[in-house]
Amino acid sequence: MMATARPLQLLNTQQHFLNNVLAAWLARGFANKSDEGWLSSMFAHKVDARKDAHSNLLSKKETSNLYKIQFHNVKPEYMEEYNKLSDEVQKELHHDTDYPCEVVGSWNTWYGEQDQAVHLWRYSGGYPALTECLRKLNLNTAYLAFRKERSKMLLSRRNQLLLEFSFWNEPVPRSGSNIYELRSYQLLPGTMIEWGNHWARAIKYRQENNEAVGGFFTQIGDLYVVHHLWAYKDLQSREETRKAAWEKEGWDVSVHYTMPLIQKMESRIMIPMVHSPLQ
């Protein structure tokens, strides 16, 4: 009986000691938020507090471009007619110098939400350019007729106003036959700057095959949303390019620190529409 009691007593003593150590570490961690001990390393990497809006800290200073992304869910029986009508109207707006806007890209979703069109517009001059463009469109009888006709074809639509990350290249027209992937991330509120800090270092791992098209974050619409736009020759090329990134030292660290910042993520594989500057 005595032989059994002594090991149990020893185990209880060891457990009591470990509990005290753990309690001390926890107290220390919560009492001193600036201390980066072992507990804080279990969570997202900390960044310094900022005293400015993330739109000023993360966007490009030398340009004042504003972007708008549109998601149109089309009635299946109208998909072909919708594409043809959009092609005609967007082409005119894109080439009309009287309107301070241009189509960056237009796509149909291939994998993801079906019977969907995605349009990305750029407004050179920021919010004043957007306001001026909308004012002129509301006076354009041809556009108003298009909008009325288009409304019959849609199930729903939504849009977001975006700024581009300073460390991404600005989207430029592409020739050839490509597929595009739009990866959208809903971040935890307050983590946009941290996301930008990590991706500013990580983007170098994803540029060797010219796959990086553009990176954006929302200003109006769904907030704390990030969109990364990628181009690949085909799905097999996408698979090989993404796999190659994991072989580069440092990419895994970037993924490790950005994953805890994400609430939700979504991937769309998209096919360019006929008039899209990004082909």
From Swiss-Prot:
Does Mitochondrion show up as a keyword for this record? Answer: yes
Cited SUPFAM superfamilies: Dimeric alpha+beta barrel
Against Gene3D superfamilies, the record matches this protein to: 3.30.70.100
Knockout phenotype, as recorded, reads:
Morpholino knockdown of the protein causes impaired mitophagy.
GO annotations under biological process? Answer: mitophagy
Q: Which UniProt keywords apply?
A: Autophagy, Mitochondrion, Transit peptide
The task this protein performs is described as:
Protein involved in mitophagy. Accumulates on the mitochondria surface in response to mitochondrial depolarization and acts as a 'eat me' signal by recruiting proteins involved in selective autophagy.
Recorded family membership: Belongs to the NipSnap family.
Query: Under which name does UniProt file this protein?
Result: Protein NipSnap homolog 1
Organism expressing this protein natively: Danio rerio
Which gene specifies this protein's sequence? nipsnap1
